[in-house]
Amino acid sequence: MDYKSAGVDVEAGRAFVQRIKASVEATHRPEVVGGLGGFGGLMRLPTGLRKPLLVSGTDGVGTKLELAQNHHCHHGVGIDLVAMCVNDVITSGAAPLFFLDYMATGALSPAAMAEVVEGIADGCRQSGCALLGGETAEMPGFYPQGRYDLAGFCVAVVEEDDLIDGRSISPGDQIIGIASSGVHSNGFSLVRKVLEKAGINENSQYGPDNRRLLNDLLAPTTLYASLVQELLSNAIKIHGMAHITGGGLPENLPRCLPEGMTAKIEAEAWPRSPLFQWLQSAGAIPERDLWHTFNMGIGFCLVVPKEAEQTALDVCHLNNHQAWVIGEVLKTPPGEHSALQGLPS
């Protein structure tokens, strides 16, 4: 008996590393020291920083992986993994530095795993961060053969004096919602139940334009890092930012608001996607659950002073991101719960 007969193919693992090497190294920034294969990734801090703060984040892709693996769509979930981490850390105004990934699988499929890593590398390039390293664990008997799970880890940097933490938010500030590409990477346990109930197959279509349902459900999560850096480089004063993930607007936007503040959201300020309309209809999902599960077409929010509203919108549109003013910051009445106004409670 040997390791391979026990389910772990070391030679396939080595071949996999060689296969992904070019994709990984294509993400490297000038600050990266050394190459792939060391025990730890090395990277210098960018020059010119006076009081740098490191910002870290970690996340996964959730049960979207089940749907993606069932339909052999591996590249997109690599982008999802980067987006779920990067979109969190940039809410502080930080610029992504590097990314690490962890993949666990029942049996290494070099082709599928390479697609995932190429997606991760794609997401890193879009975000300006280096894919500094990773781990692929082959775990036969723990994961079913052909199945894998993903985790990502991102580190970003921001000048301490430029940190965006919501403390400068005040009543009258405007909330700009930036479009999502669809469901992103949250709510897929519910999505999968809806698909099961509706008897969907890989060719099923929906909506007035007869779009392919699975294509839209598996669309990669939008990356907002380059847009945020563009907004900041245009000296737009951003008071707060929120990544709209699990829990939707009602649970994520308040995370960037200081105590004593809430927001009134105008739910008609942006068009409701036919994808969410289909999910609600096919799954008989109550309106409140819809808003508390999905992003409802808004993947990221900016909180800006009134005078910065139009400039911020212009920068979003110039960078090919749809965006709308979707609400306003209000002072919370004494003794009143700070839940968002204007959305199903």
From Swiss-Prot:
GO terms for cellular component: cytosol. The keyword Nucleotide-binding applies. Pathway: Purine metabolism; IMP biosynthesis via de novo pathway; 5-amino-1-(5-phospho-D-ribosyl)imidazole from N(2)-formyl-N(1)-(5-phospho-D-ribosyl)glycinamide: step 2/2. It catalyses: 2-formamido-N(1)-(5-O-phospho-beta-D-ribosyl)acetamidine + ATP = 5-amino-1-(5-phospho-beta-D-ribosyl)imidazole + ADP + phosphate + H(+). GO terms for biological process: 'de novo' IMP biosynthetic process; adenine biosynthetic process. PANTHER family: TRIFUNCTIONAL PURINE BIOSYNTHETIC PROTEIN ADENOSINE-3, TRIFUNCTIONAL PURINE BIOSYNTHETIC PROTEIN ADENOSINE-3-RELATED. Belongs to the AIR synthase family. Keywords: ATP-binding, Cytoplasm, Ligase, Nucleotide-binding, Purine biosynthesis. Pfam families: AIRS, AIRS_C. It comes from the Bacteria. It comes from Synechococcus sp. (strain CC9902). The keyword Transcription does not apply. One of its GO terms (molecular function) is phosphoribosylformylglycinamidine cyclo-ligase activity. This is Phosphoribosylformylglycinamidine cyclo-ligase. Its main location: cytoplasm. Its EC number is 6.3.3.1. CDD domains: PurM. InterPro entries: PurM-like_C_dom (IPR010918), PurM-like_C_sf (IPR036676), PurM-like_N (IPR016188), PurM-like_N_sf (IPR036921), PurM_cligase (IPR004733). It is found in: Cytoplasm.
